[in-house]
Amino acid sequence: MKVELAQLAGRDKDTAYNLERALAAIAACPADTQLIVFPETHLMGFPTAATVAQIAEPVDGPTVSAVQAAARERNLAVVIGMAENDNGRFYNTTLLITPEGIALKYRKTHLWASDRGVFEAGDRYATCLWNGVRVGLLICYDIEFPESARALAQLGAELLIVTNGNMDPYGPTHRTAIMARAQENQAFALMVNRVEAGDDGLMFAGGSALVDPLGTVLFEAGREEGRFSVELDFAQLELARKDYRYLDDQRLRLPGEVVEHASGVRELLIP
């Protein structure tokens, strides 16, 4: 599988600029690209409690519709973050958009300090079957909690995709976390982070990465903007799970109702 990691700078509360950059990155993908991944809340940047009502959009709004049109035109899938407005309730949301539409929606379940008072926490984990691979989404701070990735693994995830908005001085924390989450769940993990300055003096740390099911870093970006092409060989899943399978051997499983949808989406509801 050919994947493009779009490690971009963004502008907080400037949807038009961020969308333009996303559409340009999608248009520039090589013809054999199957998936492009952007950072956390890339489309809107990070709103504040005072601005979120003006900045956030529904998932069927004009900004997501423009991304859907680009995905159809290029015949590829897009994972991208947004500030979601669901009838006046606001979420830090990541979407998996295919040429057919929105295949998966995930709302951040672990809110970082600056998320609180702006967004509500999501209430479930979810995976979907895309391109023959079961995919799960996480957002930034989620990966510092092993249970988040394990929830996706219990739902069958073979590929963990993390949209990231991690800032200095916490870059090394997420490097360690993404390696651990891949290794302990014997799954591929992709993480795409923002770079350069944001509001309130934040400096985003970059370090987008691809990690294999053994926890080995196959690719790691620096701190500069860039679009990076990587390739995933899912035959490595079988090799990683040949001698032992953590999910089979674990003694304690995460609680919560599992919901299977006709679309292939599989959800674990947080009790």
Please provide the spans of the model-predicted regions:
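CN hydrolase (nitrilase-like) catalytic-core segments centered on the catalytic cysteine
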Residues: P62-A77, E144-F228
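Short polar catalytic/cofactor-binding loops
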Residues: Q7-K13
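Active-site catalytic loop in hydrolytic enzyme cores
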Residues: N85-E158, M167-T176, A180, L239, ...
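Conserved beta-strand and immediately adjacent loop positions that scaffold enzyme active sites
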Residues: V79, T93, R124, G207-S208
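Short hydrophobic-aromatic micro-motifs
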Residues: I36-V37, R134-I139, I161-V162, L190
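C-terminal beta-strand edge segments of enzyme domains
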Residues: T127-L129, R194-P271
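Extreme N-terminal starter segment of soluble prokaryotic enzymes
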Residues: M1-L5
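Cys-nucleophile CN-hydrolase/nitrilase-fold catalytic domain and related Cys-dependent amidase chemistry
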Residues: T15, L23-P99, K105, M167-A187
